[in-house]
Design a protein with these regions (language model features):
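Intrinsically disordered, low-complexity Pro/Gly/Ser/Thr-rich segments with frequent PxxP/GP/PP motifs
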Residues: 488-515
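Conserved small/polar residues in nucleotide/adenosyl-binding loops
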Residues: 638-643
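Asparagine-centered strand-capping/turn motif at beta-strand->loop junctions
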Residues: 468-472
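Carbohydrate-active catalytic/glycan-binding domains of CAZyme proteins
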Residues: 20-343
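Terminal connector regions
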Residues: 513-545
Length: 643
């Protein structure tokens, strides 16, 4: 065992710059994307600021605006986001730690959440007080006005942004028989139309809470991120008046992806990079070349559109940021092109037989579509067409009050029955980029979301019981449900209409279905004979006592060896499929007496807190293929470990 930890510790300290960068090959089609296709095209020049000499940083960031975001010589800042109060002031909740800390940047796990205030959205922000200990905060406001500041492994809550008293608490999570991918860290939140909250965890799972504080229920059984190679982290989700948006970063490839969704569960990925190093540029074209851009957060306008993105940035590899040196980190603000407000006026669904499409461009303060838009430059349709310069072309315009209606020839729109927000790209008469997404009048933007738990065998009734809940915001459509067990399917059963959050249990005969705890189940939903959803709830979970034993065992190892960083690395590798380790760990497991179960569960809960904190920031570690192979091949055994 000591040899194992020696291997981990040795590989841990071999981290290099090369190990933190991998050149990801872009799809060939991305070479043909037009301006406005990529999310990163929306970044605008940073507002003019103050530049001074004698500051920390590599040569590539000495041209920075020191009054942008938040920066202090003696503090290293990292992730955070901004809320606005009713008086118009901006409140940044950001984490940081002393720059002269013995571990340098690696002191992040002891960071403090600061509350900083500014009269300007871009800063400079000045610290008013501290909220408490914690890392990677994300603040959001509940329906009743209270403010929640999430941090890894918990949250702080207060009556308002200016509160001097913050109460610490912990969220409750129900995985609903689904595997939790990469633990529950770096959570990001978006308020839904009914003031409930949607949450995306670091691993790409989607969760929903009725009010933001009540238990978060997991809906997805796999990550919702793009189906491409990548080491994903730093998700940020938000919702505007039309749709949900999600950006996730591949920290190893230093490329981020942009996704959109009608319901927050089913996502489409747009082509092109969401951001890459170098998106922080000035009006004169000068670039602040930060080594890493992480923990993106957005500030939204009254329509929910992202108008600014904040990043945690550092001028070098994290391991090279040492105490009392020339390196450090800060949080910066970059303005965004918020896009136009668009709506399709066609009442009937757009099909291949549709001849014209009418799109209204709404007037706003500082934007007159009747005089500002270069109509000939506009293209409209599915992002799969418009992002490449294709799509519908305008044929005429009409005036509607202060708004402009553009009539497009429908040919080439690329719009299908799955479309929920067609895209427009063009230019204004000064050559500046215009873009926007249009509301379709026939689309339900508050759909039902049916989700099943793992089927359970009911011995008394001799069948399989399936619990189904509607997590959507509308009543469900007529639906039939089918259960597939180890490849064998059962007859479909009609599901009654479920109101939002309503639960219904269906009973299936067990003639064709197995009741084995290790059986593989799928629950399939059909509407009008067409499959609309397929759930794959995981295998039956081990008992709380077995889980407690596992976590307690690892907790003892952690306390004994005290190799926090190396141990964190090990946990991350094991977490890819933890349940596969249970049989090995339990080979020497002896049934514990009931009276000590409570104590074991208590210890396990304490370790889960350590575990969640430790798996965060995994991008700091180099790959160790040899050790991973040793674990997977069984060369490194865990069966000899006992309490």
């Amino acid at each position: 065992m000591k040899k194992l930890f020696f291997l981990i510790a040795a590989s841990f300290f071999l981290t290099s710059v090369d190990a933190q960068i991998t050149e990801r090959e872009r799809p060939a089609e991305w070479q043909h994307l037009v301006k406005g296709a990529r999310f990163m095209d929306r970044f605008l020049p940073m507002p003019d600021g103050i530049q001074i000499k004698g500051i920390w940083g590599t040569d590539s960031v000495l041209n920075r605006y020191v009054d942008n975001g938040i920066e202090l010589p003696g503090v290293s800042f990292w992730g955070g986001n901004i809320l606005q109060d009713t008086d118009g002031k901006y409140h940044l909740f950001v984490c940081g730690w002393p720059e002269d800390s013995p571990k340098g940047h690696m002191f992040w796990s002891n960071s403090t959440v600061f509350h900083a205030v500014s009269d300007r959205l871009e800063g400079p922000f000045k610290i008013q007080n501290s909220v408490g200990k914690g890392h990677n905060p994300e603040a959001f406001q509940l329906k009743d006005g209270r403010v929640v500041v999430y941090v890894i492994d918990g949250y702080y809550i207060a009556d308002g942004v200016d509160s001097k008293v913050w109460t610490y608490g912990k969220f409750s999570f129900d995985s609903r028989d689904r595997k939790i991918i990469e633990g529950l860290s770096n959570l990001t939140f978006a308020r839904r139309q009914d003031d409930s909250y949607l949450m995306v965890c670091r691993g790409g799972g989607v969760w929903i809470s009725k009010d933001g504080l009540s238990p978060y229920m997991q809906l997805t059984d796999k990550r919702v991120y793009p189906d491409v190679e990548g080491r994903f982290e730093d998700p940020v989700v938000w919702r505007d008046e039309l749709q949900y948006h999600l950006i996730v970063n591949d920290w190893l490839g230093r490329i981020a992806f942009y996704q959109r969704s009608k319901d927050g569960v089913h996502w489409v990925t747009e082509q092109g990079e969401a951001y890459v190093p170098g998106v922080s540029f000035h009006k004169d074209g000068a670039v602040e070349h930060w080594f890493k851009y992480e923990r993106p957060k957005v500030f939204q306008d009254e329509k929910g559109r992202a108008v600014q993105m904040n990043f945690a940035v550092i001028d070098t590899i994290k391991w090279n940021d040492l105490p009392n040196d020339k390196h450090s980190s800060k949080n910066i603000s970059i303005p965004l092109n918020k896009g136009m407000l668009l709506s399709v006026l066609n009442e009937e669904e757009i099909t291949p037989s549709t001849r014209t499409i009418e799109v209204k461009i709404a007037a706003e303060s500082g934007f007159n579509p009747q005089t500002d838009v270069d109509v000939k430059s506009l293209r409209f349709g599915s992002f799969t067409e418009v992002n490449f310069g294709r799509g519908c072309k305008p044929v005429k315009t009409k005036v509607s009050g202060k708004d402009l209606i553009v009539v497009f020839k429908a040919k080439g729109s690329g719009i299908t029955s799955d479309e929920f927000a067609p895209k427009m790209i063009g230019k204004d008469k000064k050559g500046n980029m215009l873009y926007g997404y249009a509301r379709l009048p026939y689309v339900n933007y508050r759909p039902a979301l049916l989700s099943a738990r793992r089927p359970l065998f009911d011995k008394e009734k001799g069948g399989l019981k399936v619990e189904i809940q509607n997590f959507g915001l509308s009543a469900s459509e007529p639906t039939e449900v089918e259960v597939i067990c180890n490849g064998s399917s059962q007859r479909r059963i009609a599901l009654k209409t479920l109101q939002p959050y309503e639960i219904e249990c269906l009973m299936f005969d067990s003639d064709m279905l197995l009741s084995d705890d290790n059986a593989s189940y799928e629950v399939v939903f059909f509407q009008e004979g067409k499959e609309v959803e397929r759930n794959k709830p995981g295998n039956k979970q081990l008992s709380d006592m077995q889980k407690a034993y596992f976590f307690d065992l690892l907790s003892d190892l952690f306390n004994f060896y005290s190799l926090e960083q190396a141990y964190k690395r090990l946990l991350r590798m094991l977490d890819e499929d933890l349940y596969k380790l249970y049989p090995k760990l339990l080979t020497e497991y002896k049934l514990l007496e009931p009276h000590i179960k409570e104590k074991i569960v208590e210890v396990a809960h304490r370790f889960r807190n350590q575990y969640t904190r430790l798996i965060n920031e995994s991008e700091d570690y180099a790959s160790d293929q040899e050790l991973q192979e040793r674990i997977r091949s069984g060369a490194v055994s865990y069966t000899h470990l006992t309490l």
